[in-house]
Design a protein with these regions (language model features):
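Juxtamembrane intracellular "pre-TM" segments in multi-pass secondary transporters
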Residues: 1-5, 188-217
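Helix-loop boundary and gating motifs at the non-cytosolic
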Residues: 2-52, 211-247
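Transmembrane alpha-helix termini and helix-breaking/packing motifs in multi-pass membrane transporters
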Residues: 31-36, 148-168, 346-362
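Central cavity-lining transmembrane alpha-helices of secondary-active solute carriers
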Residues: 46-64, 249-261
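Conserved MFS/SLC helix-loop-helix module at the cytosolic interface between two early adjacent transmembrane helices
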Residues: 57-95, 266-272
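Structural signature of the two symmetry-related core transmembrane helices
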Residues: 75-89, 172, 273-288, 368
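Intracellular juxtamembrane helix-capping segments at the cytosolic ends
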Residues: 113-126, 311-324
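C-terminal membrane-cytosol helix-exit motif in multi-pass small-molecule transporters
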Residues: 172-194, 374-382
Length: 399
């Protein structure tokens, strides 16, 4: 197994610091909405859905723009991380769910600007045979930062006596450290000549194999509603704030535990095989979520869900990196983020509405069904072709 490039390692630690900052805040949002602002599951679904969809529109633009500039991607990554880490701490002053929505939107705009160019930086620096490993490593450190963030928030709340608002403000410290590490530690490849005029952006011009994969991903994204609903479920079951932060930490630790191994496995046996396993287990975990009625059960299922989720993270992104031309990696990742993110609004509203007007169990059961459908379509409609000399682990799909 080849060594990971320095760029991939540094970007991994940038994500670790950024997620440390982010996850000091994100698991507190459903608690903030429920206890301070008095908003319900539909508001939570709308906030998370709108924020993710807005980010996704920008991900396609930023990825495509970084391609047009000859692979100049770092400026987009730095700008995006900076915006997010200036906007997030202001949630400490939010007094209405509309303000929470606005600030989450600014946070996600930053994510939208940085994500596709950052993923393309990883692709630019990595040889094809270790792409799954590279993305799995990156996701593992990202999830490791999420573990650390929620643990830091729990420790501060438990032992310092500071209110939630001050914990949120403290997140600016690791966030700005992430920006500094990226600005000083990543050196991108020498840029190619800028493209004076990009071809029109049309979904019809996307290769059929990629369109099929994106369609399946969109269905899976409908199942993958915001994980803050797991926190809300714990709150409804009577868990206290510190316990919920520890639960969030356990979720992300479970993701980190399988992310790198899942990426390596995808490089060996094929990305589609790993995705099929991960998505099937994901559907099973949501069936379990619908049946639990105790805090202990929630802990067990949350850890199981995290292990399943982490298993497929590296494979999902490594697959995308194989589809576009080397000069259009940013655009390929932009399409990926756009499709997944645009599903976030209807997914969040559907999940929140089922939760509020039917039951939490119904919301989880519907999500499980959608995940199972995505796994089935991956196998029967968008499965990799072994023709055409694709390398082992390649996920080129049949036209």
């Amino acid at each position: 197994m080849k060594k990971l490039p320095r760029t991939v390692i540094v970007l991994g630690f940038v994500s670790l610091l950024n997620d440390l900052a982010s996850e000091m805040i994100v698991p507190l949002i459903p608690i903030l909405l429920a206890t301070v602002i008095g908003a319900g599951p539909v508001a939570l679904g709308l906030i998370e859905g709108v924020a993710e969809a807005l980010a996704s529109l920008l991900k396609l633009w930023s990825g495509r723009r970084s391609d047009a500039l000859g692979g100049r991607r770092k400026i987009f990554a730095v700008s995006g991380y900076l915006l997010s880490n200036l906007a997030r701490p202001l949630l400490a002053f939010a007094g209405s769910w509309g303000t929470v929505l606005l600030l989450r939107a600014f946070d996600r705009v930053g994510k939208g600007i940085r994500s596709a160019p950052r993923d393309a930086l990883v692709a630019d620096a990595t040889s094809p045979e270790i792409k799954g490993y590279a993305y799995g490593f990156h996701r593992a450190l990202d999830n490791g930062g999420a573990v650390a963030g929620s643990l830091v928030a729990a420790a501060v709340l438990a032992w310092s006596g500071l209110p939630m608002s001050q914990v949120i403000l403290l997140s600016v410290i690791p966030g700005l450290l992430a920006v500094a590490l990226l600005a000083l530690g990543v050196k991108e490849s020498a840029p190619k000549s800028a493209i004076k005029r990009l071809p029109p952006l049309r979904i019809a011009d996307v290769p059929p194999r990629l369109r099929r994969y994106l369609a399946v991903l969109a269905i899976f994204a409908f199942a993958r509603a915001s994980e803050t609903f797991i926190v809300l479920r714990g709150f409804e079951l009577g868990a206290q704030t510190v316990e919920l932060l520890l639960l969030w930490s356990a979720l992300n630790l479970a993701k980190a535990a399988t992310s790198t191994a899942g990426g390596r496995l995808a490089d060996r046996i094929g990305r589609a095989h790993v995705l099929l396993i991960a998505w099937t287990l994901f559907a099973l975990s949501f069936l379990f979520f619908g049946k639990i009625d105790s805090s202990a059960g929630l802990w067990a299922v949350t850890v199981f869900y995290g292990l399943c989720f982490g298993l497929g993270e590296g494979a999902e992104r490594a697959a995308i990196s194989e589809y576009g031309d080397a000069a259009a990696q940013g655009t390929a990742f932009g399409w990926y983020h756009l499709v997944v993110g645009l599903a976030a609004i209807p997914a969040g509203l559907l999940f929140g509405s089922l939760w509020q007007w039917q039951s939490p169990a119904m919301a989880f059961f519907v999500a499980a069904g959608l995940a199972a459908l995505a796994a089935l379509l991956l196998r029967v409609w968008a499965w990799p072709s072994k023709t055409g000399g694709a390398p082992q682990g390649d996920t080129v799909l049949r036209p």
